[in-house]
Every structure is written in C-alpha cells, then in structure tokens.
C-alpha cells in the first residue's frame, strides 16, 4: 500500500472559517500526520510531532533516533508543561485574531501598491501570501534590489525542484505590525514596478 503524508503545521491557524478535518481523521491506518509546535506556540520551540499508523511506529522511532538523536529535553518539557497547565486553545485563537488583521493589511497593501499585472492568494489562515508577477520577472535576481529597499521575501523557486516559480514570491505577514506591513509592501511594490519597467525597456 501507499502511505499519505499530511504535513499540516498551520492547520490550527485558520481565521476565516473552521479548518477542514484532517485526512488522518478519515483514515488513521494510511495517513501520517505531521505538526509543529514552532507554528502554534512559539517559533523558538523547534519540536515537531507525528501521528502515525501503528504499523509504522517502531520504524519511525528508529529513523528519528538515527537522524536527530534526541530533541532538546528542555524544549520538550517546556511544551509538555505548557500544554498541561496553560489555555493553549485560547492562545491559538488570540494568535489567529492577530494574524487575520495582518493578513488583511497585506492584502489591502498589495491592492494599493503592486502593479495590476500581479496576482496573489487570499489565504484563510497561516502566515503567508503567494504572489505571482509577470513571467519576465525573476524574483531571485530581484532580491538584492528588494534588500536595498529594506524588504525581503522568499523567491518562488525555493518551493520547486525544477526551477519553476521564478516569477513568484512568498510574503510573510506573521511578525510585522500592520503599519510595517504597509511600509514594506509599498517599498516592494516600487521595486517590482521598477523591475517591470526595466524589463520592458530591455525588450523594446
């Protein structure tokens, strides 16, 4: 048989509507479910977790021990104490309220400051917006100019094994305040427009 890996570190961070049921809820014998406390509690707690079919449990333990030896005991105990003694569901709900405000700030700023040729996702949760620019724009090559403008992003090619996504970028709204998001998107929009103008001049 074939096992399905359900990598869902942002599954609890939905804010427009309830998150869909996990695939593992429908098939616990064929789905491996992965999560991470670094997304839901604190970014410095670099501990992941997995729900696996019973038939794979021993193999996964061996694979984990051979690859990472042992995660930090201190971090594991910190997480265990937090989950036992703190209202973590309420904490996640408050995080989602903050992220929704920041998501909205980014979407509004993209509409105001990015060229009409650009398109982007409207995420219902998580940390990121995916932006597509015209195909002639290479976001990896454009990165140094963005950094000069004091903004950064992840080029789309980082998410593909074949070089695809060169005209795409991933923007994060997780950490900055709405005001900083607006400033950053405005600056990045100027960089994108200048790059489009330069590319257009080169083609003419």
Task: Identify the meaning behind each predicted range.
Residues 1-204:
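PLP-dependent class I/II
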């Amino acid at each position: 048989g074939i096992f399905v890996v359900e990598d869902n570190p942002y599954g609890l961070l939905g804010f427009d509507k309830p998150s869909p049921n996990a695939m593992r809820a429908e098939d616990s014998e064929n789905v491996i479910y992965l999560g991470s406390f670094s997304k839901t509690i604190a970014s410095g707690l670099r501990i992941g977790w997995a729900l696996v079919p019973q038939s794979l449990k021993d193999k996964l333990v061996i694979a984990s021990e051979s690859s990472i030896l042992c995660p930090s005991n201190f971090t594991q105990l910190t997480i265990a104490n937090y989950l036992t003694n703190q209202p973590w569901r309420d904490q996640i709900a408050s995080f989602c309220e903050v992220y929704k405000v920041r998501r909205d700030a980014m979407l509004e700023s993209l509409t105001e400051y990015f060229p009409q040729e650009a398109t982007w996702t409207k995420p219902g949760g998580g940390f990121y917006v995916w932006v597509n620019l015209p195909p002639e724009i290479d976001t990896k090559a454009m990165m140094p100019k963005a950094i000069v403008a004091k903004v950064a992003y992840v080029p789309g090619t980082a998410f593909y094994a074949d070089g695809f996504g060169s005209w795409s970028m991933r923007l994060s709204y997780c950490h900055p305040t709405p005001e900083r998001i607006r400033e950053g998107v405005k600056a990045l929009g100027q960089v994108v427009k200048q790059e489009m103008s330069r590319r257009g001049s080169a083609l003419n």
